[in-house]
Amino acid sequence: DYESSGSKNKETGCCSLDSINDARNIAVDLGFHHNILDIRSEFGDYVIDYFTDEYMLGRTPNPCVLCNTHIKWEALLKRADKLGCEYIATGHYAKVNEIDNRFYVSKGKDINKDQSYALWGISQKNLSRTMFPLGNLEKDEIRDIATKSGYDNLVKKSESYEICFVPDNNYRNFLRK
């Protein structure tokens, strides 16, 4: 979360209170349940510890791959099972293709926003239950859909290119803490 990251901006990142409220409002508008998973402990133990350990060893970590592979997908599918859901969908810019009973992550339509590189570690079992609805759209198309649906506030949000738990992109400050 932003407090432990040293960020001065509460509204940065995918897990900000504003982002959670935006997701809840859309869920209410579209008539489906909004669930929040508290995976801070697992995230800290697995992703943040890995990140700091790798940096201290002089290596460049890729925490997003670990998070997607071991934290996010496991937690989402566990909750999906409890809710009786067969599939999960995320907002990643990527595609899942099935060829000869094997599942592959491939680049999304918008190559400037492609996130397939961060999804390579997801297991076959988990990929078989995953959908990426944004994978067949360009970012501008998504903005148009959001605007036409009355979500102008989402279109105006700035995009984040940083690691979610280092939202100011200040690794040095984060590692000191």
Role assignments for model-derived ranges:
Residues 114, 118-177:
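Contiguous mid-protein beta-loop-alpha structural module that forms a pocket-lining wall or clamp
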